[in-house]
Amino acid sequence: MPDQDKKVKTTEKSTDKQQEITIRDYSDLKRLRCLLNVQSSKQQLPAINFDSAQNSMTKSEPAIRAGGHRARGQWHESTEAVELENFSINYKNERNFSKHPQRKLFQEIFTALVKNRLISREWVNRAPSIHFLRVLICLRLLMRDPCYQEILHSLGGIENLAQYMEIVANEYLGYGEEQHTVDKLVNMTYIFQKLAAVKDQREWVTTSGAHKTLVNLLGARDTNVLLGSLLALASLAESQECREKISELNIVENLLMILHEYDLLSKRLTAELLRLLCAEPQVKEQVKLYEGIPVLLSLLHSDHLKLLWSIVWILVQVCEDPETSVEIRIWGGIKQLLHILQGDRNFVSDHSSIGSLSSANAAGRIQQLHLSEDLSPREIQENTFSLQAACCAALTELVLNDTNAHQVVQENGVYTIAKLILPNKQKNAAKSNLLQCYAFRALRFLFSMERNRPLFKRLFPTDLFEIFIDIGHYVRDISAYEELVSKLNLLVEDELKQIAENIESINQNKAPLKYIGNYAILDHLGSGAFGCVYKVRKHSGQNLLAMKEVNLHNPAFGKDKKDRDSSVRNIVSELTIIKEQLYHPNIVRYYKTFLENDRLYIVMELIEGAPLGEHFSSLKEKHHHFTEERLWKIFIQLCLALRYLHKEKRIVHRDLTPNNIMLGDKDKVTVTDFGLAKQKQENSKLTSVVGTILYSCPEVLKSEPYGEKADVWAVGCILYQMATLSPPFYSTNMLSLATKIVEAVYEPVPEGIYSEKVTDTISRCLTPDAEARPDIVEVSSMISDVMMKYLDNLSTSQLSLEKKLERERRRTQRYFMEANRNTVTCHHELAVLSHETFEKASLSSSSSGAASLKSELSESADLPPEGFQASYGKDEDRACDEILSDDNFNLENAEKDTYSEVDDELDISDNSSSSSSSPLKESTFNILKRSFSASGGERQSQTRDFTGGTGSRPRPALLPLDLLLKVPPHMLRAHIKEIEAELVTGWQSHSLPAVILRNLKDHGPQMGTFLWQASAGIAVSQRKVRQISDPIQQILIQLHKIIYITQLPPALHHNLKRRVIERFKKSLFSQQSNPCNLKSEIKKLSQGSPEPIEPNFFTADYHLLHRSSGGNSLSPNDPTGLPTSIELEEGITYEQMQTVIEEVLEESGYYNFTSNRYHSYPWGTKNHPTKR
C-alpha cells in the first residue's frame, strides 16, 4: 500500500508539473503576442538582463552591435528580444504548429511577426541586428508548418523578405561579413527553400526576385550561406519555369568552380542543381563553353554514389551535342564510365535529402552529418544500380558517334555492358529490371553499327535475338526494352547459363585465341574478299598491330599450285617494296609478311577507327548525311595519298574501296589493304583483272590495259557515295552492272545539298574514256580553291601548335632554370651555414670549450654532435683562414659596389669638406663606438641577433656603411687604438662576425682614410633632388585594382571582362605560382607588355569576342569591350589585360571616390560608398 500511495503521489506531481509548464508556456506566448502587437512607433524598449550563456541559437554569436553593449558577462536587450529568444528555444523541435493546442496563439504571433516586424520598414530600420535575427529565427521555425507559408504569401511577406535578403546579401558580398549577416542569410535561404519545396509556391519565389539573390550568393565565402543558396535553388529548379529564369542568369561558371574547388557536400549539391538546370539548352551550351567537361570527368573518380549519379546524368544531357560527345571521348570519359560499370569500386552514400540538409544547415548541424556508416548493403546496392543505369544511359548517347562506338567496343564495352543484362534474384526487382532495360538499350545502339553485329549474333538465342532486332535502330524510349527484359528473366537456368557463357566468349581480356608465328591473336576485326584481319600483339611486346590473313586457295591467285606460288611470290615482292618505300601520313605502314600453312600473313599498323563503309551504313540508318566540309576534308586526303602513290612511287592501289579507307580521330584518312597494289614502270600499263567490281573502272572490265587512272575512277565512286550514301553503280545482275560501269550511267546527285563543284568533280572522275579521264593532279587542280582553304586551316593549326610548343618549351625551360637556381641557392645556403658554423666555433673556442662548442653548433646548425666531431678536426685553422679570406674578398666587392652606386646617384664635390658640424661628428662617433663595443650584459641579446632565433638562418649584424661615410678620418685615427684594444679584448663577446673584426683590425686606418676620401666631398644639388618612384608601391596599386575587381558583388548576367580578370587573378595565386612569379607578372602588367599571358586561361567562348581599337564594340550585341582578335589559342597580352582592368574600374566607379581611396572603413560601418 505505501508503494501504491507513493506512485499516486508521483503521478499527481508530474501532472501538476505538466500543467504548470503548460500554463507558463501559455503565459509566455500571450506576453510575446502582446509585445509584437505594439506598433513600431509606440514600441518601448526596456532593458532587462539575462545570462549570455543562453544567447545562442545560431552557429556563431558575434558581439552585439547596435542593440546594446556587453557589461560584466551579460547582454542588455529589450524584453521582446528576450521573449523571441525563449520562443526559439522552447519550440525548436516543433513541426506542426497548426495542430498544437495553442495553434491560435501561434497564428497570431506569426501574423504579428510579419505585419508589425518583417514588412514594417520603420521597425526594420531601427531594430538592432540581433533583434531582427531572432525575428527571422522565429519565422523560420513557424514556417516548418505549410499553413504558415501560405499566410506569409497572403500578407505580402515574401516580397519584403526577398528585398531584405538582397540588401543583406549585397552588403555581405560587397563589404565583407558584418554582425549576424551570415546567420540572417542562412535563415532567409532556409525560408525560401521551404517555400520552393512545394510546386505551386515556386512561382512566388521567382516573382519576388529572390532567385537572383540566391544566384549571387553562390559567390559567398561562408559555407553555410553557400549551402543554403544551393539548397533553395535546387528546390526551385524542379520546375521548368523556374529553371528557365535561373538559367538566364550568370550561374554555370560559378557552379563549375564549386565542383572544381569546394568540399564534398558543396560539390554534391552543386552537381544536383546543375543536373536539373542542364535540361535547358543554354546551360548545356555554357557547360561546353566554360570547359566544364574536364571538371565533370574529374569527379568520376569520387566514391560518393549520389555525387556520381548527378555527374553522370549531367554528362547524359550535355553529350547530346556532337562536339561535346567527341570531347568526352578525348578526355577519357568512355573509359571512366566503363570502369564504373565494372563494379569493382567501393562506394559510399547517405540518407540525406534536400529538406533534411536545409534543416540541418539552418540549425548549424550540417557538418555533423556522416556518410554511409548507417546505410545497409541493400541500400548501397540499389544506389549502385541507379548509378550503373545512368552510366548505360551516358554510353547510349555517346555511341551515336561512330568513333565513340568503336572505342566502346575496343575497350571491351560490349562485354562489360552485357554482363548487366543477366538477372539476379538477390537484387531488388524494380531496380534490377530498370538496369537491365538501360543495358539492353546501350547494346541495341551498339548493334546498330554494322561492324558490331557479328558480336551480338553470338550472344542471344534466336527468339530473344528476334525481339532484340525488332526494337529498331536508335530507339531511346526505355519502355520499348521492357518486353526484352521480361523474356530474358523467364528463361530457364540452362538457357541463362548459355547466355552467360556467350558473354564470356566476347571478353577481350581473356587469354589469346591462338598464336600465329610470334603473334597472339586478340580479336577478329573484319573480313574481306581475300581473307580476314585480326588484332594481334607480338609475343614479347606490348604494341597492338593488325595482321591480315590471305587464303592462297582463292581462285584469284591461280587455278593450280604453280600459278598460286607465282602469284604469292609477286605479292610478297610487291609488299616488300611497299614496306620499304611508303612513308605518308595517309597510307598505312607495313611491317612484315610471312607464309604459314598455305596462308599469307601481312603484319601492318593498327589503325584506330572505322572503315569509311561503316560510316556510310551508320549515317544511312540515322538518316544523316556528310556535310560538304567533311566530304572535302576526306576527299582531299585521298587525293594527297594517291598523288604520293602515283607520282612519287608509281604504285597503283587497284582495290580502292570504302572498306579499305579508315577514318580515325577528326576524320584522319588512312588508305589500307595494299595486297593487290602493283608497282609499274613509267608509261606502262597493267592488265590483270583484280579489285572489287563495284569500284572497277571500264578498262578493267573490258580487260584492257590500265594505269593509275583506275584509282581515279574508284575515288570518283567514293566521292559519289559520300554525297549519296549509295554506290554510283549497283545491280544484282552482273551483266547489267558491267554495262552501267562501261557506259558510266548513274543516278545524278540530288540537287540543293552540295555545291556544283561536287557534281562536276564526280562527273570528271567517272569519265568512261580513260584518255579523257583526268589524273590525280588534274583532279586536285579542279578543287584548288577548296584545297587552298584546307591548306590555310592546316597552316593555322600548325602555327598554333608551334606557338603552343614554344610556350611549353619556354615554360619547361623556365621551370628547369628555376629548379637549378633553387639548387644553387640551397647549396650556397648550406655553404654559408657551414662557414658561419666554423666562425662561431672560432669565436666560442677560447671561452666555452669543446663541450659548449659542440652543443651550440648542434643547436644552431641542426647538426648532431657526433657529425660535428667527425668534421671538426685538425684542419680547422686552415679552413677558417680560407673562409676569412673568401669573406674579405666578398666584403671588398660589396664595398666597391656600394661606392659605385653612391657615385651614380650623387654629385661629388671637393669644396664641401667642411660641411660637417662638430656635434654631428661627436654623435656619429659615439654611435660608431657603441657599434664596436659590447658589455657583458648585452651578450645574450647580441647572440640572439647573431643566431637569428630558433630555427632561422644565422645573420650577422653588419656595420652600417652610411655611418662610416660620415666619420672624418682624423677622428677614426684618433681613436683607432682604442677600438683595436676593444677588438682584441672584447671580440669574443661581440655580435660582429670574425670576418669584419679581422678586416677592421688589419686594415682599420686605411679603411677609415678610404671611406673619408670617398665621402668627404659629397653634396647634392637642390635642383637635382627628385621624388623617388617606389616600384613596390606601383606593384601594390596594380594588385589592389585586381583584387578590388574580383571582390565586387557578382553580376547577375555574364560579364566576360570580369571573368578574364578573375581567371588572371587565380593564375597569379595558383599553386604553380610563387612570389617571384607574382612580382614579375604584375610588373609586366603595369608596363603593358605585349607578351601573351601564360598559361592561356581562356575558355571556348572568348573567340566570339571582338572589339575595335577605339574601344567601341564591332557588334552592338557585344558588350564585352575585350581587345581585338582574341583567339582561343593566342590568348591575351598584358597590355590588353591592362586595358580590360581599367575599363572595369571605370564601369564600377573605382575612380569616383579618389578622396576615399586611401581611407580604411571598419567592417560594419554604414557610411561607406555604396556604388561599386
UniProtKB/Swiss-Prot annotation:
InterPro entries: ARM-like (IPR011989), ARM-type_fold (IPR016024), Kinase-like_dom_sf (IPR011009), Nek10_STKc (IPR042666), NEK_Ser/Thr_kinase (IPR050660), Prot_kinase_dom (IPR000719), Protein_kinase_ATP_BS (IPR017441), Tyr_kinase_AS (IPR008266). The active site is at residue 655. GO terms for biological process: mucociliary clearance; positive regulation of MAP kinase activity; positive regulation of protein autophosphorylation; protein phosphorylation; regulation of cell cycle G2/M phase transition; regulation of ERK1 and ERK2 cascade. The keyword Secreted does not apply. The keyword Nucleotide-binding applies. It is an enzyme of class 2 (transferase). Residues 855-875, 898-954 are annotated as: Disordered. Expressed in the lung. Its EC number is 2.7.11.1. Residues 919-945 have a biased composition (Polar residues). It is linked to Ciliary dyskinesia, primary, 44: A form of primary ciliary dyskinesia, a disorder characterized by abnormalities of motile cilia. Respiratory infections leading to chronic inflammation and bronchiectasis are recurrent, due to defects in the respiratory cilia. CILD44 inheritance is autosomal recessive. PANTHER family: SERINE/THREONINE-PROTEIN KINASE NEK, SERINE_THREONINE-PROTEIN KINASE NEK10. This is Serine/threonine-protein kinase Nek10. It comes from Homo sapiens (Human).
